[in-house]
């Protein structure tokens, strides 16, 4: 049984990374894709765990070889997802999360229309600005740029299958878990998972 591909998108500061990490802690059968990026490593990040950090030259060479399922440029940095790794992980029966922006999501949907997509929103612009400020990673100028980008990004929520509002973290996490659980209980998935039982019941 092949796994399900999930696209998870959100504006910077909406809590996507924290929610996905909490979901992974509770769901061992789910994996998260590690993207390639040309942006610099932030404090606490580990190469190969958070991202595959690479040079712009190497990234463009991989792009030329058609190695990416999707790619996008965000804040002047390039991001991409290895198509071969995605296909291998799904073939192993594992569910896989792609944490990508709306541009990448559009590319993935064209190639893999069966992918499930989830958009995470903050409860307000004020809450989003506060979260970006509390990070302590960016200057006021960068925060203003991120806020402008966020408004543009959030307008694409209508393209997604599911919408999660991250007002209360625990509630948002429950919503995220419910999306994954409902997918696992679909008739076709259950039929594959319990083929032997169904055979005995209908014998």
UniProtKB/Swiss-Prot annotation:
The keyword ATP-binding applies. PROSITE patterns: GUANYLATE_KINASE_1 (PS00856), GUANYLATE_KINASE_2 (PS50052). Its EC number is 2.7.4.8. It catalyses: GMP + ATP = GDP + ADP. Residues 3-181 form the Guanylate kinase-like domain. Its main location: cytoplasm. One of its GO terms (cellular component) is cytosol. Keywords: ATP-binding, Cytoplasm, Kinase, Nucleotide-binding, Transferase. SMART domains: GuKc. It is found in: Cytoplasm. ATP binds at residues 10-17. One of its GO terms (molecular function) is ATP binding. Belongs to the guanylate kinase family. Essential for recycling GMP and indirectly, cGMP. HAMAP family: Guanylate_kinase. NCBIfam families: guanyl_kin. This is Guanylate kinase.
């Amino acid at each position: 049984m092949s796994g399900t591909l999930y696209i998870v998108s959100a504006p910077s500061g909406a809590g996507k990374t924290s929610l996905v990490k909490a979901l992974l802690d509770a769901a061992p059968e789910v994996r998260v894709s590690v993207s390639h990026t040309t942006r610099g490593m932030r404090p606490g990040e580990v190469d190969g765990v958070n991202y595959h950090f690479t040079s712009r030259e190497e990234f463009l060479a991989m792009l030329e070889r058609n190695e990416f399922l999707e790619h996008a440029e965000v804040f002047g940095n390039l991001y991409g997802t290895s198509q071969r790794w995605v296909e291998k992980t799904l073939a192993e029966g594992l569910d896989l999360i792609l944490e990508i922006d709306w541009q990448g999501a559009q590319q993935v949907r064209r190639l893999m229309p069966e992918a499930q997509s989830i958009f995470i929103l903050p409860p307000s612009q004020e809450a989003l600005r506060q979260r970006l400020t509390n990070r302590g990673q960016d200057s006021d100028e960068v925060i203003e740029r991120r806020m402008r980008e966020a408004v543009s990004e959030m307008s694409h929520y209508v393209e997604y299958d599911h919408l999660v509002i991250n007002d209360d973290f625990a509630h948002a996490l429950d919503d995220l878990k419910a999306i994954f659980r409902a997918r696992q209980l679909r008739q076709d998935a259950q039929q594959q998972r319990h083929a032997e039982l169904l055979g005995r019941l209908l014998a």
